[in-house]
Amino acid sequence: AGLRPWQASKFYFRAGFPFGFRGRSGPPPGALTINLAHYDALLGRTYAEIGSHARSMHKCQGMSPLIILPGTATASYRLMETTISDQSEQDEVSLFDGIDTSIEGLERFAGATPPDALRAGLIEVAEHAREALSKFQRDGADGVRESVVSGLGVVRNLRSRLSSLGLTEDAAWEIDHRLAAKEDQFERAVILAHGIRLEALADDGV
């Protein structure tokens, strides 16, 4: 129970100023630059707009309430330390370069020879997630209902079987901790895809 030891794989410092402020003509040399002007169709805004809107809510420190206008916006970061071999020598395009964030990648916690049943279960969970995303992009929320319900069942089944796969206590905890987050994501996707909304009302109507 409680928190377990962990170590960050990368440590970055911000390089330059956010949103391209102060007239910088280009990204700092040797820095990773992220495009903040990407439009998110689900959110209806760019990430720069979302960030500047949150920043405008400051009620102290003399912050400006101005919202960034549509257009080019970037943020740059410099990798200062990393536990990933030779990563500091790479020209990065993402903060996650060199880090396996896939569902299938969770098998690494099981050591050099993870159980076949674990590998198969993780692949199945990942396939349902990818299928749901593909159907959503093609058909919208109505098209993902079967995939997210099936995916929820698969991740719940895998979590229930972890203790029988011969994993060490630490390996089982690390994998289950992350699958619990994936289960929560599937649950929220099921609720959204089916348009479920619950409201709790008191007997007195208040």
Name each region found by the language model.
Residues 1-195:
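Metal-dependent de-N-acetylase/amidase catalytic core
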Residues 196-200:
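Proline-enriched interdomain boundary motifs that mark the N-terminal boundary
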Residues 201-205:
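Short beta-strand segments of immunoglobulin-like
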